[in-house]
From Swiss-Prot:
Residues covered by region (Disordered): 100-119, 177-200
Entry-linked Pfam families: Chitin_bind_4 (PF00379)
Keyword annotations from UniProtKB, A to Z: Cuticle, Signal
Protein name (record): Pupal cuticle protein 20
Source organism of this protein record: Manduca sexta
Function summary: Component of the pupal abdominal endocuticle. May have important role in the larval cuticle structure.
Gene symbol of the encoding locus: PCP20
Residue ranges, compositional bias (Polar residues): 101-110
Cellular-component GO terms for this entry: chitin-based extracellular matrix
Biased composition (Gly residues): 185-200
Gene Ontology MF term list: structural constituent of chitin-based larval cuticle
PROSITE patterns noted in UniProt: CHIT_BIND_RR_1 (PS00233), CHIT_BIND_RR_2 (PS51155)
Signal sequence bounds: 1-18
Length: 200
């Protein structure tokens, strides 16, 4: 009898814990925000009221027990940034163009079109640009092309390879002007004297 009671208790606990959906996994309800709203009081969860941190029955930031969002319809994360222009054109033949600008200076544009089929099928070439301002005030502007050979960005903020030393450039130029007969390792049998300048 005790074994049946123990198994039944374990099953009830398991079913009870499985049936509860934690609020951190739920999306906010439409029209409600995370911070609560004016007049939601301090009777529910974290962040109820007008910027307060309510202490009540189990809600995340709402106005009642178990509520998730607040009642004020506010949004978190600062001011909303307007989209000042938006264009999206899809011509149906595979070519397209889109662009947008926002109120805080972010802009992007891209156009693309299919090209003649290559060995792997139809290739689409895209060209575009985007720009934005970093938190420290630096303007970032990037242009790019993307095709069957990859993504090719250009911008003054991108790192560049270090310059090739003069000695290496002279060596490369010498090798271009004086190619070897085979272009591969010859086992030390080339050059004058048979030892290629090595002294044994």
């Amino acid at each position: 009898m005790a074994t049946i009671l123990l198994v039944l208790t374990a099953v009830l606990i398991a079913v009870g814990s499985c049936g509860r959906l934690e609020p951190q996994y739920l999306p906010p309800r439409p029209g409600n925000g995370f911070g609560g709203g004016a007049g939601s009081g301090g009777n529910a969860g974290l962040g109820g009221g007008a910027g307060g941190s309510g202490a009540g029955a189990g809600g995340f930031g709402g106005s009642g027990a178990g509520a998730y969002g607040g009642s004020g319809g506010s949004h978190g994360g600062g001011a909303q940034i307007p989209i000042t222009s938006f264009e999206n054109v899809n011509n149906g033949d595979g070519s397209y163009h889109f662009s947008y600008e926002t109120g805080n200076g972010i802009s992007a544009q891209e156009s693309g079109a299919p090209r003649a089929p290559g060995p792997e099928g139809l290739a689409v070439t895209a060209e575009g640009a985007f720009s934005y301002r970093t938190p420290d005030g630096q303007q970032i502007a990037l242009t790019y092309t993307a095709d069957e050979n990859g993504f090719h960005p250009l911008g003054p903020h991108l790192p560049t390879p270090p310059p090739i030393p003069e000695e290496i450039l002279r060596s490369i130029e010498f090798n271009r002007q004086n190619p070897s007969s085979e272009g591969s390792y010859n086992g030390g049998n080339g050059g004058s004297g048979g030892s290629n300048g090595y002294h044994y």
